[in-house]
């Protein structure tokens, strides 16, 4: 997300808040102005080197926005009514006795400075004059009636410590606690921010939500209660629409504008890896909180409730600790941190001390600094990961949000937890789930001393957006003012956790080795990276001793450096990315390109899971993939067949028109992937827990796959569409589970394309030179779609396709036909057909004995499976060869006879010709390809319903895994083909019916003596009838 620091200006040069006063007072005020002016210049100088050129243009075309503290606004109002001297005294007293909110350092924007139409760098929606949002941050401070106050002192110099290190990249969005685990900041319970209302500020309605807020660490001396939080920088809050007729008052918190947090950073000092709270409530008030941790990365949120009886809340953090930020230099660390288990989530009974010794602070600071660049897989001469502006955000659960789109949207954690809390009304699970939220929420879940704004909240978290299970927290206790307490949140059901490790198991487009990172324009291995760098820096000139067409792979990449270097250039490696001065580090201009590619990979994964879950739900309970069999998992220990994804190229910006083959092409032959468009599809999102009971309505349960889950509140309820869980209503608890989008669509760029790009892959033709290739029948619907189109095939399907040798099949076929008719005047064509089928059966047996799943079975089980599937596979083989290899209907033999090749697929029954053509047309309409063919062949072979199988469990596991791989493959590579998986599965019974008729015909011929005996074909016919 594009963010940049706007210098905090003290007050505008043409404004004077003090009128006639004593000369001493005027002199002090003049010094104060000069001091702030000097700080402003320093901040601008420090800011300049971090600006991207687009930001510089935006900053140059937009006026700098002055910010005023509320104490100055109070002095301005007081001056007009009670005089300058009394006003200065009142402000000084307010400075030493600030209210319990400790927002003395909060800067707001006055509406008169904005003219109702200024936007920062064009990234936020234009600001409009609206009622201020009096919500405070539930994680930062607790707002109550100002009957008691705490002494705070604002140190403006701290702005320099917390505001000048923003490099506007993904590195600044992580912190590294003492336990070493990286935490994505977007997963922290997200706060809601707004201006603070002051009774003495009569022009409150003229203020708007700030575009930039900054909260400095405080050092109060309160002992009754404390909230320990890291200093937080907030950037770019987008104001939401609100009813203009709604009145704004401190008693009606939830009726004003609420801001959407688009980007923020957290700096952690000392040993603060989490937030701890201790809350003191007034008499008659109740407070309850619970925490739940997801099976993946979800953590429980904290609910706090403060009564109307003088709460004391302080914010404490030592200013001596110099906060540092950890860095992520690769997508591997980003995904690893999102998958890694987090530190234990604090609950309401956990209290952390704010006092640490200077030695501990120094140790923590040294630990965080030393860990800044650990774990990065980029070598020192790689391109530095310059994360410039492009309008993308990645949340903790891999969600993707394009903030440049005209459609407001969100992806990430679903609803969950309880009803609204005191400050922003968001549900606990929704906060803990991660992701971005649009928050106009309403009243709280239960009353407290008659105050509807101080409700109890159940914080049963529902894990992450992928549906991890969460444990429900206890509901709130009812106060004297209202007998209804919050109900307990129920645990969420476990879903499949997203595994991002497969994103990095890609193959080098040059040699096929495993990639190590982005090098000189695209993902390559370490060997090709070093070879390319040495060639360019040393200006080497190679020659090829062959025909300049040497095959380059992992085993022989060093044989011909000429052809290897040419292939590096062909796949898209950039000469200009290599530094001629031999200095370490790459060219920063490629940084945005790398970040854009990483963000799209996570977006692809999210969309893949959503679509796959939707299809599985529509298919019902029939499709239930089981874990991979031990034998297959041992052969591929790092494989996740359900979530495999391959993106071999960065984007069209990093490659030439004739660009790199995909990883499947490296394994199976060259592929022209320049025209096919694909998008990945989702996995199971799980089911979220139920929210706590609302003030006037019971709890609601949101299902991870519900299309429109809503609560039972008596006000307008917010619903989750698409594949999201139900949202919480104004007066009711929120439902849980799923990934939520406000319109059910995941959009790309600024257009309205749905989550499944209407850019399918053409049929994969099996030619003499390649196993898989695209046709250009379909095209991507947008430029953004074209950037993420390379073929993504799971390793299982790649392994299946490698086991098929169509060239050998056709060679053996025509060789047998010519051999049988050599020096023969005339032959029996039916007998010749039986010999060809017998040869095909031998080929089937040889193929099956060397395939995964099948080779682990005992011989008896193998024979039973082959005896019940051979005819179906023969029909499918012939359909495949007609569609993909252009097998003709007939061929002329050496003796001049015409042999009907189609009879091989009909098993000698000419009456089935029309039926056979109908099946072929159905498969072609479904864009039947090699991946579909091998999966369907395995589904026919691994039939767990065959009687007499001893190791039925292995067969069933293999069948389910293949079925899941086919489902994932069809959704991944053919999103534009409706119900392709269902169509392919439905064709299998039709093939079987046709094969049964062919078997009966062959058996009849055999009994009549017209067919040859003592052949494998006849043995199969008899064995099936005996069984």
Swiss-Prot record:
Residues 792-1024 form the NR LBD domain. Residues 505-580 bind DNA. Residues 36-48, 300-324, 335-349, 443-461, 697-721 have a biased composition (Low complexity). Disulfide bonds: none annotated. Changing residue 583 to I: 10-fold less binding. It comes from the Eukaryota. Residues 20-48, 273-427, 443-493, 682-756 are annotated as: Disordered. This is Nuclear hormone receptor FTZ-F1. It comes from Drosophila melanogaster.
């Amino acid at each position: 997300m594009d963010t940049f620091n706007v210098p905090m200006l003290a007050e505008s040069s043409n404004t004077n808040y003090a009128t006639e006063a004593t000369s001493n007072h005027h002199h002090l005020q003049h010094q104060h102005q000069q001091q702030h002016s000097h700080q402003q210049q320093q901040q601008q100088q420090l800011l300049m080197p971090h600006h991207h050129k687009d930001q510089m243009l935006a900053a140059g075309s937009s006026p700098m926005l002055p910010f005023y503290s509320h104490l100055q606004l109070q002095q301005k109002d007081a001056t007009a009514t009670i005089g300058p001297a009394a006003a200065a005294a009142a402000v000084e007293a307010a400075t030493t006795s600030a209210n319990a909110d400790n927002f003395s350092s909060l800067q707001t924007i006055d509406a008169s400075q904005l003219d109702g139409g200024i936007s920062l760098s064009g990234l936020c929606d234009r600001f409009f004059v609206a009622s201020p949002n009096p919500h405070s941050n539930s994680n930062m401070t607790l707002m109550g009636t100002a009957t008691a106050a705490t002494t705070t002192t604002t140190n403006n110099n701290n702005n320099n410590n917390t505001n000048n290190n923003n490099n506007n990249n993904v590195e600044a969005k992580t912190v590294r606690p003492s336990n070493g685990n990286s935490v994505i900041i977007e997963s922290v319970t997200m706060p809601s921010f707004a201006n603070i209302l002051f009774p003495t500020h009569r022009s409150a309605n003229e203020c708007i939500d700030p575009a930039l807020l900054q909260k400095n660490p405080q050092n109060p001396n309160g002992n009754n209660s404390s909230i320990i939080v890291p200093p937080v920088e907030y950037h770019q809050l987008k104001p939401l629409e609100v009813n203009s007729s709604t009145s704004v008052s401190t008693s009606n918190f939830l009726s004003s504008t609420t801001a959407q947090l688009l980007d923020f950073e957290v700096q952690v000092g000392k040993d603060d890896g989490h937030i701890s709270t201790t809350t003191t409530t007034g008499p008659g008030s109740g407070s309850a909180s619970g925490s739940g941790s997801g099976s993946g990365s979800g953590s429980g949120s904290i609910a706090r409730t403060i009564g109307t009886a003088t709460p004391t809340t302080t914010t404490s953090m030592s200013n001596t600790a110099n906060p540092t930020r950890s860095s992520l230099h690769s997508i591997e660390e980003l995904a690893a941190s999102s998958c890694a288990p987090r530190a234990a989530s604090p609950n309401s009974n956990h209290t952390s001390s704010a006092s640490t010794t200077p030695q501990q602070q120094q140790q923590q600071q040294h630990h965080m600094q030393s860990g800044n660049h650990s774990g990065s897989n980029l070598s020192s001469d790689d391109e530095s990961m310059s994360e410039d502006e492009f309008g993308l955000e990645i949340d903790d659960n891999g969600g993707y949000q394009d903030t440049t789109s005209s459609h407001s949207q969100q992806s990430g954690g679903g609803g969950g937890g309880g009803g609204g809390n005191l400050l922003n009304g968001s549900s606990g699970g929704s906060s803990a789930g991660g992701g971005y939220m649009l928050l106009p929420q309403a009243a709280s879940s239960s009353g407290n001393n008659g105050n509807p704004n101080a409700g109890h909240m159940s914080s049963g978290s529902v894990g992450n957006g992928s549906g991890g299970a969460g444990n429900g927290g206890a509901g709130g206790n009812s106060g004297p003012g209202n007998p209804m307490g919050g109900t307990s949140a129920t645990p969420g059901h476990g879903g499949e956790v997203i595994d991002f490790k497969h994103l990095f198991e890609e193959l080098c487009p040059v040699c096929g080795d495993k990639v190590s990172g982005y090098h000189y324009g695209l993902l390559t291995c370490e060997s090709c990276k070093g070879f390319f760098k040495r060639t360019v820096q040393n200006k080497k000139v190679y020659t090829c001793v062959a025909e300049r067409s040497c095959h380059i792979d992992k085993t022989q990449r060093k044989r011909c450096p000429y052809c290897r270097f040419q292939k590096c250039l062909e796949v898209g490696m950039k000469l200009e990315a290599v530094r001629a001065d031999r200095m370490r580090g790459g060219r920063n201009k490629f940084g945005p390109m790398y970040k854009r590619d990483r963000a799209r990979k996570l977006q692809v994964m999210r969309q893949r899971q959503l679509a796959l879950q939707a299809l599985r739900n529509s298919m019902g309970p029939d499709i239930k993939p089981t874990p991979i069999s031990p034998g297959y998992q041992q052969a591929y220990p790092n494989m996740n067949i359900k979530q495999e994804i391959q993106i071999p190229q960065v984007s069209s910006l990093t490659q030439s028109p004739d660009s790199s083959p995909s990883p499947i092409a490296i394994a199976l032959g060259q592929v022209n992937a320049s025209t096919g468009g694909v998008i990945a599809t989702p996995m199971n999102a799980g089911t979220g827990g139920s929210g706590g009971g609302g003030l006037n309505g019971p709890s609601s349960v949101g299902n991870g796959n519900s299309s429109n889950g809503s609560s039972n509140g008596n006000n307008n309820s917010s619903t989750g569409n698409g594949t999201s869980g139900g949202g919480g209503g104004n007066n009711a608890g929120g439902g849980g589970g799923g990934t939520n989008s406000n319109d059910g669509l995941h959009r790309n760029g600024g257009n309205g394309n749905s989550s499944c790009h209407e850019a399918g892959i053409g049929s994969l033709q099996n030619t003499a030179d390649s196993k898989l290739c695209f046709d250009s029948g379909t095209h991507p619907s947008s430029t953004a779609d074209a950037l993420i189109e390379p073929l993504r095939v799971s390793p299982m399907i790649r392994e299946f396709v490698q086991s098929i040798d169509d060239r050998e099949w056709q060679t053996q076929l025509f060789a047998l036909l010519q051999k049988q008719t050599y020096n023969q005047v005339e032959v029996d064509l039916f007998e010749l057909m039986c010999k060809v089928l017998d040869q095909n059966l031998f080929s089937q047996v040889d193929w099956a004995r060397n395939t995964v799943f099948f080779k682990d079975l005992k011989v008896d089980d193998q024979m039973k499976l082959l005896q019940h599937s051979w005819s179906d596979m023969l029909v499918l083989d012939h359909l495949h060869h007609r569609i993909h290899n252009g097998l003709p209907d007939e061929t002329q033999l050496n003796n001049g006879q015409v042999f009907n090749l189609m009879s091989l697929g009909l098993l000698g029954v000419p009456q089935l010709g029309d039926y056979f053509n109908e099946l072929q047309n159905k498969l072609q309409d479904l864009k039947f390809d090699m991946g579909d063919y091998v999966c369907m062949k395995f589904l026919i072979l691994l039939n767990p319903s065959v009687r007499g199988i001893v190791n039925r469990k292995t067969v069933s596991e293999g069948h389910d895994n293949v079925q899941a791989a086919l489902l994932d493959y069809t959704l991944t590579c053919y999103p534009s083909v409706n119900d392709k998986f269902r169509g392919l599965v439905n064709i299998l019974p039709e093939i079987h019916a046709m094969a049964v008729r062919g078997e009966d015909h062959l058996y009849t011929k055999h009994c009549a003596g017209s067919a040859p005996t003592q052949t494998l074909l006849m043995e199969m016919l008899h064995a099936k009838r005996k069984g």
